Amino acid sequence: MAKSAEVKLAIFGRAGVGKSALVVRFLTKRFIWEYDPTLESTYRHQATIDDEVVSMEILDTAGQEDTIQREGHMRWGEGFVLVYDITDRGSFEEVLPLKNILDEIKKPKNVTLILVGNKADLDHSRQVSTEEGEKLATELACAFYECSACTGEGNITEIFYELCREVRRRRMVQGKTRRRSSTTHVKQAINKMLTKISS
């Protein structure tokens, strides 16, 4: 049997936006009413995505980490879910600064991420419009989903599957670039040797 592809995903966002609820909804198809928002957890999950077995390691960050912890999590992850609460404008405004930190830590690589507006079931208390979420996702050059970890509204499974697909696509592109670059170095070395021999 072929070895499964391994993907490391990390969930970021302000405390209370529903990161843990989102992960638990994805893994168990259930909603948890009570949990400790200060706990950080790592989950393992295996799924078949586009006929390939993928092993996900999902880091659910507490949202209250210090800078060193957060940067460590960002270095660890390959794909990122940035979550805000549609009823909390402050959580939405924290997304761009988070992305900027990610860019700084991951450079020169492009960051693979998905933007998620959670708590879509609380539309009556909405502070962030769907259009604002879409506009930010365009700025961040990433996919955007609105969902509810509480009701299961929105395709939560697709959020995680799409992020895995994107991580694997980026890996393939980087692998091809690396191979091309090493082939170029070999060609340059041979040309230098031939130049020396002929001179």
From Swiss-Prot:
UniProt binding sites for GTP: 13-20, 60-64, 118-121
Function summary: Binds GDP/GTP and possesses intrinsic GTPase activity. Has higher affinity for GDP than for GTP. In cell lines overexpression leads to a reduction in the rate of proliferation, colony formation and in tumorigenic potential.
Single GO BP term: negative regulation of cell population proliferation
GO molecular-function terms, A-Z: G protein activity; GDP binding; GTP binding; GTPase activity; nuclear estrogen receptor binding
Keyword GTP-binding in record: yes
Classification via InterPro entries: P-loop_NTPase (IPR027417), Ras-related_GTPase (IPR051065), Small_GTP-bd (IPR005225), Small_GTPase (IPR001806)
Broad class of enzyme this protein falls into: hydrolase
Similarity comment text for this entry: Belongs to the small GTPase superfamily. Ras family.
Superkingdom of origin organism: Eukaryota
Chief location bin: cytoplasm
Entry's induction text: Up-regulated by estradiol. Down-regulated by tamoxifen.
Catalytic activity reported: GTP + H2O = GDP + phosphate + H(+)
Signal peptide: none
Keyword line: Cytoplasm, GTP-binding, Hydrolase, Nucleotide-binding
Subcellular location: Cytoplasm
Pfam families: Ras
Cellular component aspect of the GO annotation: cytosol; fibrillar center; nucleoplasm; nucleus; plasma membrane
Protein name: Ras-related and estrogen-regulated growth inhibitor
Distribution of this protein across tissues and organs: Detected in heart, brain, placenta, lung, liver, skin, kidney and pancreas. Detected in estrogen receptor-positive breast-derived cell lines, but not in estrogen receptor-negative cell lines. Expression is decreased or lost in a significant proportion of primary breast tumors with poor clinical prognosis.
EC number: 3.6.5.2
